[in-house]
Design a protein with these regions (language model features):
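Conserved ABC ATPase signature
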Residues: 17-21
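Conserved ABC ATPase "signature" region
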Residues: 1-13
């Protein structure tokens, strides 16, 4: 507990009830708790939502550290720059997996004459537009 408190900057709020904490500290606490058990697989649902940019960066350093130790980490995010940190991405749209692959694979799938080298966000938007066109009669 003390190692995680230090790693996530939680010592200053150790005596506070969790319902009194700002969202950023709640997110830090949740990630620290999940890492204390040294899981083989870690599911993180929008772990950086509601945190400041510095804390967001720190979260990804912790996540990458876990991956380097052999932990499988699955992350849901609406931040496309965060999706690009991942080895593999699954694009879920309207409850369906419509594309999956490495960030480079998804960008290549969505490249066109107008956007020969799309950003991750442009790729996601293009893949969704393509899916909508293919499934417009459903």
């Amino acid at each position: 507990i003390s190692r995680m408190s230090e790693a996530f900057g939680l010592k200053s709020i150790a005596s506070h009830a969790t319902d009194e904490l700002p969202l950023g500290f709640k997110q830090r606490l949740a990630l620290a708790c999940s890492l204390m058990h040294e899981p083989d697989i870690l599911f993180l649902d929008e772990p950086t939502s509601g945190v400041d940019p510095l804390t967001r960066r720190e979260f990804w350093l912790h996540i990458n550290s876990m991956v380097e130790k052999g932990v499988t980490v699955m992350v849901t995010t609406h931040f496309m720059d965060e999706a690009e940190y991942c080895d593999r991405i699954g694009l879920v749209y309207r409850g369906k997996l419509i594309a999956s692959g490495t960030p480079d694979d998804l960008k290549a799938q969505s490249a066109n004459d107008e956007q020969p080298d799309p950003t991750m966000e442009q790729a996601f938007i293009q893949l969704i537009h393509d899916w909508d066109k293919e499934h417009s009669n459903e």
